[in-house]
Amino acid sequence: MCTRYYADIDKELKPFIDEAQNASFAQQMMISLSRPLTMYGEIRPTDIAAVIAPARNGQRAVFPMQWGFSISGMKTPIVNARIESAAEKPTFRDSWYRRRCVIPASWYYEWQHYKTPGGRTRTGEKYAIQPKDSDITWIAGLYRFEEMNGFKYPVFAVLTREPSEAVSGIHDRMPVILPQSAVDDWIALNGDPDEIVKSAITDLVLEKA
């Protein structure tokens, strides 16, 4: 799972955050959802974040999006989508083919999970995880539009996959992280998501947070 990531406004992510905060519907989104437009620091589910997606002309743009797909009858939104089943799941199928996005982050957080002698899963130490030799973690995601009181706004979910060797010691899932060179292809309407994810990054570094 991926339920936390960090966006450092003092470094390479500032242009993305600035663009999202200045989007034409950003203020209305903040008011309608009663959420701040901070978009930096530790980002949690239901926060508004800066997300890369295609504009109407097909060009890359950055928009404010809320983290999590709302599901009728569920109190909490779905924040992750399993890459193995996203193309078939009714919740994500349309987004998989038509609405893909990228979440620029400094790193993501994960908590170590381990089994007790009695077989119970416990949560251990918190780790910051990012690609080796990269200042930006390009997290693959899906998005769609939801509506509240007549206001339509975008929401996103993070795609997850089986962990790389480096991550497998602390968790059984990790986000799909793209190389920078694949960002435009991933969000393109004519992109082939099954082919693009083959370039996903698995060489990651971890440190205790």
Where are these regions (language model features)?
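Short linear sequence motif anchored by a di-proline
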Residues: 1-209
